[in-house]
Amino acid sequence: MKSSHRFPLRRQIVWGMRFFTILTSLAVGAALFILSNQYVRANSLQAAEFNLRLVATSIETSLDSADALLNWASINSTVRRYISQEDVNGTQTIAAYEAVQEKYYSSTLYSHILRFFITNENDRHLQFGTLNSSAALNRTTIKQFLTKGYGMQFTTDPLLPGSPDCIALSQPVRSGKGTLHRGSTYLALDTAIITDPAAGYSLTDGSALYWEMGSRLWQIQNGSLTETENRLREVDYTLRTESKSGVTEQTAWQSKVQLDGQNYYVVKVTLNGRSAALVQLLPANTF
């Protein structure tokens, strides 16, 4: 005789099917939840990358205009004649001054130029910008602008203590055949060329936007740049999109990092041809 405490076979089958259905539903729900989180995370990181590209493109446009201005100053025959010839008369001096003046005022960067000069690094200088009324340029003061060589750097004006930070670009002026060093051309731009394009940038709670240049890092916040310890220097990034030759497309990177016990996703977009990048941190717990 069968035990009265044992479920009939049919009841066992029903309960088994119910239990299986519950387990299946839980598994499907968990899988959908994971897939949903992955989808949201992927979309959020892609959106951050897209937004960084927009800001980076605007900054690149300004820096390309700066390069164009410096290139013009270094090869313009009227300016180079004034810089390089031993004997220059008044007419040549005025012609060089007016040529640079016209280029300065017509530049798309005009409102951002703090200091712009071309010099033979001795006794001839053509200078424009809002800081040109500071200490005079001469053989000694010129050297203070070029202590780190040519290129792009984040600095302050050496002749005006307490002046705001600026992005400085410089390059040499050479002879017509490009062999002899004739002088230097220097351009200092206010940091609004970075902060203006980033104005209104959408950040979620806990996110942060940064400007990285060389090994240094600045947070972009409330229209200003604040230097901070670069704890992202050793981040192991994964390449997302590589810059294409001849096409304005910045190289994009992604990674994950732990800072102060909290996990973050990192999206980085490097500017074409420059040791600079825009970086966004996104808290991992928001996905």
Protein language model regions, located:
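N-terminal sensory and localization modules of signal-transduction and trafficking proteins
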Residues: 1-10, 39, 46-47, 119, ...
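Juxtamembrane/transmembrane-helix boundary motifs in multi-pass membrane proteins
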Residues: 4-12, 37, 41, 97-98, ...
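Juxtamembrane extracytoplasmic/periplasmic/luminal helical "stalk" adjacent to the first N-terminal
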Residues: 7-86
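Extracytoplasmic/periplasmic sensory segments of membrane signal-transduction proteins
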Residues: 46-53, 62-150
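Extracytoplasmic/periplasmic sensor domains and loops in membrane signaling proteins
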Residues: 93-98, 102, 127-159, 222-256
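Solvent-exposed, extracytoplasmic
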Residues: 97-110, 177-180, 184-226
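Extracytoplasmic/periplasmic ligand-binding sensor regions of membrane-associated signaling proteins
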Residues: 109-112, 118-191, 196
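Short, hydrophobic beta-strand elements of compact beta-sandwich sensory domains
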Residues: 168, 172, 180-191, 258-287
